Amino acid sequence: QGRMYQRFLRQHVDPDETGGNDHYLNLSRRNIQCPNRHEGVRFNTDIHEDLTNRRPIDEHEGVVRVTDKTEEG
């Protein structure tokens, strides 16, 4: 698989299916590996599915659990 795809998986996929609450959002925001975190993305989405559930979606349309994150001012 390509380098960009692997980067996407690292930054946006949470295979443990956690998330959806303020603690998760704040913790994941702190753990984003950006050189200039304050100049980074103001909106982000995490996918909460394991590989088995995600694989069909990688190839075709489907539904997954996600958490949308926005930077707090």
Swiss-Prot record:
GO terms for cellular component: extracellular region. Keywords: Antiviral protein, Endonuclease, Hydrolase, Nuclease, Pyrrolidone carboxylic acid, Secreted. The modification Pyrrolidone carboxylic acid is found at residue 1. GO terms for biological process: regulation of defense response to virus by host. Its main location: secreted. The keyword rRNA-binding does not apply. This is Lactogenin.
